[in-house]
Amino acid sequence: MVSWAHEAPTPGSRGAGRTKDMAIIGIVAVDRNGAIGKRGQLPWHYSADLKFFKGQTTGNACVMGYKTWLTLKRPLPNRLNVVLTRREGVEARESVVWLRDRESVLSLKDYLKCDLYVIGGAQVFRVFLGEIERWVVTEVPLAVEGADTFMPAGFLEGFRAEDTRRLEDDLKVTFYARAV
């Protein structure tokens, strides 16, 4: 069983057992036009990118919107699944936390001993734009016809590329950090 949480801090302890601050990282795959979805689904399938996503996010927390949650067949394994929703009566599940707003997610900072990956969808990316410290962006070599969900314009403004890695011949991922 993966443990994501520190012991609850006591008054004055400032996060008992913390070894590092939680980083908030956006992770996304985008086509040439910034598309991330079509009819509520990821409009491509690249095994190398899915494997990369799993490697990056395993052992961490992943925050997603309810629509993204619905596209999953089950909770992402070995990750704390944080689902943003205002819906009532959602089913309790192991390794899934249901939260209602951005502030509730940010309050996890005092308790998590892992990073928080913002994994989508578009509304959730918009909500956390000001909080994301780093981006991990897979560039999909397509222009998806009929795409209906896009990344917010300028989401990488104020960030600089630090590293690029090839996942496949035509698929690359770029790591961005907030410019200081």
Across the structure, where does each feature detected by a protein language model lie?
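Residue-identity detector for glycine
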Residues: 12-17
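Enzymes that bind and transform nitrogen-containing heteroaromatic metabolites
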Residues: 18-180
